[in-house]
């Protein structure tokens, strides 16, 4: 069951949009980080069940942050949220351990679908 969701994105506008797409009635605790380094540090502290990660960020990009998070927790559920939907970028994200990829800007529908997929995966793990 998802309780905590971490959003890692260098754009305050993108974070605001993502937060607006996450259902309010589920009681999720939302956290955000402005770059990959802060995101990894926050992940260590709060251990969210779901992380939405941008790819293009300063300090530490999303690929590097994803790699660090998967080293910390191989079963971490990281959904990449990016405008870069090139096949190569998506393949690299999956190779590094991303659970799935959604296109930015996010919509309530694709965020809800991503959350449902993660919930199903977590339920299947028991």
Annotate each language-model stretch with its function.
Residues 35-38, 61-64:
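Acidic catalytic/metal-coordinating carboxylates
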Residues 88, 106-116:
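C-terminal output helix
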Residues 64, 85-100:
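Alpha4 helix (beta4-alpha4-beta5 surface) of REC/receiver domains from two-component response regulators
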Residues 12-31, 96:
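Two-component/phosphorelay signaling modules centered on CheY-like receiver
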Residues 46-52:
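Active-site beta3 strand of CheY-like receiver
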Residues 57:
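Receiver (REC) domain active-site loop signature in two-component systems and cognate sites
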